[in-house]
């Protein structure tokens, strides 16, 4: 842990100070512990280089800030992390256009591309509805039109998806989720080519100053040591829970690639090596009081934001005063998100069923 590095000579300092991304000068730019984390993540994501940030949102904002300029157009697909969508709106102040579109299949994306589109940004599976997109088809189209592709792949972790193998330019992860894995660290990463990541370092990282602390980098490295075991548990646990819930008539619809059909199932099989344990469902009711009763009846599952740590979490999208916003996002007000943590999945399943029994009695 240090903020500043010492040099043996004037010449050594001069050499390092003009190339801070490859030398240790000041921890705001680079640090040995953070570089170790970056090297591991680049290898896991099959990219040339990685830059780590203090949060996932730090990685997202630095990437968009670095690669877009006045007059450019940003195209965002389906439901994405809300703060990323808000940041895109903020970029309008700098003359950067953006649109967020909802599509049923990948081919619909391309009719929304403009002459000035510079980035196609998406999640796959998407936030909230967990829809899959055809990564290879998006990448092929984008390369023909000189458009960059950026995916937030946090849901599947670096172990269960490899977007760069299918031509995606940049992969973002929130390290606060599966990589950290213990609900005690914030962080974000972007992985891609040397050229693009160096550009993000020079502008987004250095100017926006979302620097990850060496200690947080160490915590993320600690998390990576158990990531394979935790993802194996996630893959097995989510199947236990979803197999038991899929025929429950109190649930209108389940959102998760494991429960998908037809083309969505084919895309999941092509692009996912396993399943993350974050899912959602709509309660089969118009009585919004049942949403509150369900959430308040959970005993093992905690109520809270974020996910990817050790504990199971639940979150309802309906907050009592946001029906118009949910309609705009095309979400049912009875939509509930659940993360299955490291507990015994049967314990989590019993908790969900108890809450359903209480809400629908």
Please name every model-derived segment.
Residues 21, 185, 215, 274-278, ...:
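Short, solvent-exposed beta-strand edge segments and adjacent coil->beta transition regions
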Residues 239-299, 303-309, 322-327:
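Conserved small-domain helix->loop->beta segment predominantly found in fold-type I
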Residues 3-8, 177, 258-262, 283-287, ...:
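Glycine-rich beta-alpha junction loops
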Residues 88-89, 98, 118, 285, ...:
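PLP-dependent enzyme catalytic core of the Aspartate aminotransferase-like
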């Amino acid at each position: 842990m240090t903020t500043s590095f010492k040099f043996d000579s004037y010449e050594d300092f001069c050499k390092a100070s003009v190339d801070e991304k490859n030398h240790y000068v000041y921890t705001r730019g680079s640090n040995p512990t953070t570089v170790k984390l970056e090297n591991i993540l680049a290898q896991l994501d099959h990219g040339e280089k990685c830059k780590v940030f203090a949060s996932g949102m730090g990685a997202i904002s630095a990437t968009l800030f670095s690669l877009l300029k006045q007059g450019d157009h940003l195209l965002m697909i389906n439901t994405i992390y809300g703060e990323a969508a808000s940041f895109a709106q903020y970029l309008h102040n700098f003359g950067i256009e953006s649109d967020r579109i909802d599509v049923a299949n990948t081919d619909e994306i391309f009719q929304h591309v403009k002459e000035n589109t510079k980035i196609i940004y998406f999640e796959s599976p998407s936030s909230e509805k967990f829809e899959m997109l055809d990564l290879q088809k998006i990448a092929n189209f984008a390369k023909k039109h000189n458009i960059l592709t950026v995916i937030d792949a946090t849901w599947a972790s670096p172990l269960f998806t490899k977007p760069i193998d299918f031509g995606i330019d940049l992969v973002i992860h929130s390290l606060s989720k599966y990589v950290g894995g213990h609900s005690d660290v914030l962080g974000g990463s972007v992985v891609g080519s040397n050229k693009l990541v160096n550009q993000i370092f020079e502008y987004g990282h250095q100017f926006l100053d979302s620097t990850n602390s060496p200690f947080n980098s160490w915590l993320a490295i600690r998390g990576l040591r158990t990531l394979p075991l935790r993802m194996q548990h996630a893959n097995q646990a989510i199947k236990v829970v979803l197999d038991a819930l899929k025929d429950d008539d109190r649930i209108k619809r389940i959102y998760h690639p494991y429960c998908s059909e037809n083309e969505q199932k084919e895309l999941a099989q092509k692009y996912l090596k396993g399943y993350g344990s974050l899912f959602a469902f709509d309660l089969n009711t118009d009585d919004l009081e049942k949403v509150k009763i369900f959430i308040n009846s959970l005993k093992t599952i905690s109520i809270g934001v974020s996910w990817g740590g050790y504990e199971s979490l639940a979150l309802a999208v309906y907050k009592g005063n946001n029906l118009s916003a949910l309609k705009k996002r095309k979400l049912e007000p009875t939509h509930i998100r659940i993360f299955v943590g490291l507990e015994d999945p049967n314990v989590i399943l019993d908790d969900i069923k108890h809450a359903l029994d209480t809400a629908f009695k």
